[in-house]
Amino acid sequence: MATVRAKFWVTGIRHLHQPSPDQVFAEITLAPVYAGQDGKPANADWSKATPSGEIKMGVTNPAAIEKFTLGQKFYIDFTPAED
């Protein structure tokens, strides 16, 4: 199986009000990084030019929400999944 690796960064964390105080919901938004620290394209595996895209996740686990901070970078591996 071939894997495509993408480097994304957190561009938004939006906390939404929930009717119950013990419920949480945050919308986490990520976008592709344009260049690596060495100035070379960070996402050359999948984009020959300026990479574009967006990942949005609705997260309801407080421990998971705490793992994301604005500006933080992540590698995201796309590996085919079986049914």
Describe the residue ranges of each PLM region.
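Short, basic/aromatic beta-hairpin or loop at an interaction surface
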Residues: 42-55
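Short, compact, well-ordered microdomains
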Residues: 54-83
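Basic, polyanion-binding surface patches
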Residues: 37-38
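Short aromatic-glycine-enriched beta-strand elements
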Residues: 22-31
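Short proline/glycine-enriched turn/loop segments at secondary-structure junctions
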Residues: 18-19, 45-47, 64
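A broad, low-specificity signal marking well-ordered, structured residues that form hydrophobic/aromatic
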Residues: 8, 28, 55
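Structural detector for short beta-strands of small beta-barrel domains
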Residues: 3-16
